[in-house]
Swiss-Prot record:
Complex and partners: Homodimer.
Binding site for chloride: 105, 354-355, 443
Topology relative to the membrane: Multi-pass membrane protein
Intramembrane ranges, chain numbering: 107-114, 175-187, 191-199, 385-399, 400-402, 403-414, 415-419
Record's protein name: H(+)/Cl(-) exchange transporter ClcA
Family: Belongs to the chloride channel (TC 2.A.49) family. ClcA subfamily.
Residue ranges annotated as motif Selectivity filter part_1: 104-108
Residue(s) at site: Mediates proton transfer from the protein to the inner aqueous phase: 201
Motif mapping: Selectivity filter part_3: 353-357
């Protein structure tokens, strides 16, 4: 027996038997599962990529209307208000009338489905999330398309399971997870982050087998290839490429992580508080719900005219920040302002996510921190943009409690691979401080709220298939 074989046997002997059985006994992945995972990834990539293009089309059309026809016979501010109010109305109406589970991010719904506690009515969720998201995001509200893309990807996975009449529960679970991974990979052009998001963030629900891991990888890669074929291979965020920072500055990155850890706990609390306040206000009454949502959308139409930095998901704002167009004071004001607008939009139950708004908040505070650090420590060679990138990963890690996903996500989105060390330090610092303060992951909190929601329990649980 060779030394290598002896080492492998000794290593296996030290591992728990249930782990060995779970992984190695299912080493022979059926070809059908691999094929279905590939199909799920392709469809999730198509849905995610065209959803992004549809949102951009709505936003550009809204701007064109304001510049031409409508703006010629209505005051500009009134036209902006009415258009955005109508777009938001579409999103809120579709959600409240046809698929209440499509409200908000949608990621907690997929996690609940992976745990067997929530149904996936893909025949409702896919059209409602797609067209409702077009309306809500196109109105200028502070919402991200990434959470909806994950939910639609998961819905695609369940759709494929139903169409091909997959009965095996492990396979259905794997395809659901594969769809979620494909959705995130297509949303951010980040296949590694899509894979790791399912494995790390959804770890309480994800069933770790070689089959499920392979399904997730295949789907994420396929979805990302589809994205790149349609949109090209450029990174989602165009920004400067930085070299590795000096070792003497790493302590500042740890401090930034600690600050984001504290803020992440507060931010998660404010999100759930905002949702509770909105529910108490409209009490699930459709007229109140639609009127409130339309008014919010209209107000963001006005903000688009006068303070556009406080509107939209925030991905397009990130390059503007890192190009150095704002001072620290303005950045902190925008940071506070976007906290309020994020809570207002996400808390209202609109069909949109919180990924992109969180990344924008991390960039705002991180760049402001970098500017202040550069002023206080002129002897250090500080690039504020490095702290902006680290801030993106840190806030994601503190709120979602998935530091590895946050690190990979930011690196893939910005192509700043040299910043891996400061990203690790900042993200881990944020997670540690958030845990010390007793904070809980945001999606776990949102899933808990969903399971307590009587309206969702009554309207969403039946039926389980489109024909029942």
């Amino acid at each position: 027996m060779s030394t290598r074989e002896t080492f492998k046997i000794s290593l296996l002997a030290k591992m728990p038997k249930d782990v060995i059985n779970q992984f190695l006994s299912k080493d022979k992945t059926p070809f059908s599962v691999l094929f279905l995972s590939l199909l799920v990834g392709i469809l999730a990539g198509l849905v995610g990529t065209y959803f992004e293009q549809a949102v951009h089309l709505v936003s550009e059309t809204r701007t064109d209307w304001l510049k031409s026809e409508i703006g010629s016979f209505l005051p500009l501010w009134l036209a902006a208000f009415l258009i955005s109010a109508f777009l938001a109305f579409i999103g809120y109406f579709l959600v409240h009338r046809f698929a209440p589970e499509a409200a908000g991010s949608g990621i907690p719904e997929i996690e609940g489905a992976m745990d067997g506690m929530r149904p996936v009515r893909w025949w409702r969720v896919l059209p409602v999330k797609f067209f409702g998201g077009m309306g809500a995001l196109g109105s200028g509200m502070v919402l991200g398309r990434e959470g909806p893309t994950v939910q639609m990807g998961g819905a695609v996975g369940r759709m494929i399971s139903d169409i091909f009449r997959v009965k095996n529960e492990d396979t259905r679970h794997s395809l659901l997870a594969a769809g979620a991974a494909g959705g995130l990979a297509a949303a951010f052009n980040a296949p590694l982050a899509g894979i790791m998001f399912v494995i790390e963030e959804m770890r309480p629900q994800f069933r770790y087998t070689l089959i499920s891991v392979r399904a997730v990888i295949i789907s994420a890669v396929a979805a990302n290839i589809v994205f790149r074929v349609i949109n090209g291979q450029d990174a989602v965020i165009t920004m400067p490429q930085y070299d590795a920072p000096e070792l003497s500055t790493l302590g500042l990155f740890l401090l930034l992580g600690a600050l984001f850890g504290v803020f992440g706990v507060l931010f998660n609390y404010l999100i759930t508080l905002a949702q509770d306040l909105f529910v108490k206000f409209h009490r699930n009454d459709r007229k109140r719900y639609l009127l409130t949502g339309s008014m919010i959308g209209g107000c963001f139409g006005l903000l688009l005219l006068y303070v556009p930095e406080l509107t939209g998901g925030g991905i397009s704002l990130i390059p503007t920040i890192t190009n150095g167009g704002y001072g620290a004071g303005i950045l902190l004001l925008l940071f506070v302002g976007r906290i309020f607008t994020t809570l207002l939009c996400f808390g209202s139950g609109a069909p949109g996510g919180i990924f992109a708004p969180m990344l924008a908040l991390g960039t705002l505070f991180g760049y402001a921190f970098g500017l202040i650090a550069k002023m206080w420590f002129p002897e250090l060679n500080i690039e504020p943009g490095m702290f902006a990138i680290a801030g993106m990963g840190a806030l994601f890690a503190a709120t979602v409690r998935a530091p590895i996903t946050g690190i990979l996500l930011v690196i893939e989105m910005t192509n700043n691979y040299h910043l891996i060390l400061p990203l690790i330090i900042t993200s881990l610092g944020a997670v540690i401080f958030a845990q010390l303060l007793g904070g809980q992951p945001i999606y776990s909190q949102l899933l808990h709220r969903t399971l307590k929601n009587q309206k969702l329990q009554q309207q969403d649980l039946p039926p389980q298939s489109p024909n029942s």
